[in-house]
Amino acid sequence: LKLHDIPNTVNKAVEEIAQFNILMTTIHLQGGAEMIEAAKSAAGNTKILGVSLLTSLDENDTSELYGNSFDDQFTKLITLAKSSSVDGIVCSPKELISLHDLNKIKVVPGIRNAQTNDDQKRTMTSQEAYAQGADYIVVGRPITQANNIEAAIEEYLA
């Protein structure tokens, strides 16, 4: 669940999410400062994580969508995150190196321990992501679509 809507709608959604004692939920940083603050004001103990750019996007996508290079768009979103009350950042492992001085939670999707042919364009292994400063990793299909889910989980924990 990645929230991205007008501030009032995001505020009400986060208010509902927070009632379930959820540890973290995500919002798109592209929703802007007012939306971020609306989410935080309703979060209670739930941490609000700001999604930077989806791991399925690359340079061509950001140029087409935002008229910016990937790096410029990422920098704009991280600058917004730094000046906001967001508790953490969701970004691909490839961008972690630029966040070493950021004192916020770092959640990293796009984790692949083997070469895959899926829609993830900016990936890294779990070990590489942790070495680059990830606090949490997100592994989806390599686990949920594995023939042996327990073995797949062990592979990512190793």
What positions do the PLM features span?
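Internal alpha/beta core interface subdomains
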Residues: A131-Y136
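Conserved anion-binding
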Residues: D5-I97, L102-I105, R112-T116
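C-terminal helical cap(s) of enzyme catalytic domains, especially alpha/beta-barrels
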Residues: I36-A42, Y130, I143-A158
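Short hydrophobic alpha-helical runs that function as membrane-insertion/retention elements
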Residues: V90, I137-V139
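N-terminal organellar transit peptides
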Residues: V107-P109, E128
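Short glycine-rich, acidic/polar surface loops and turns
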Residues: E95-L96, T123-E128
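Conserved, mostly hydrophobic/aromatic
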Residues: K2, T25, A81, A129, ...
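Catalytic-face loop-and-helix region of soluble metabolic enzyme cores
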Residues: P109-R122, V139
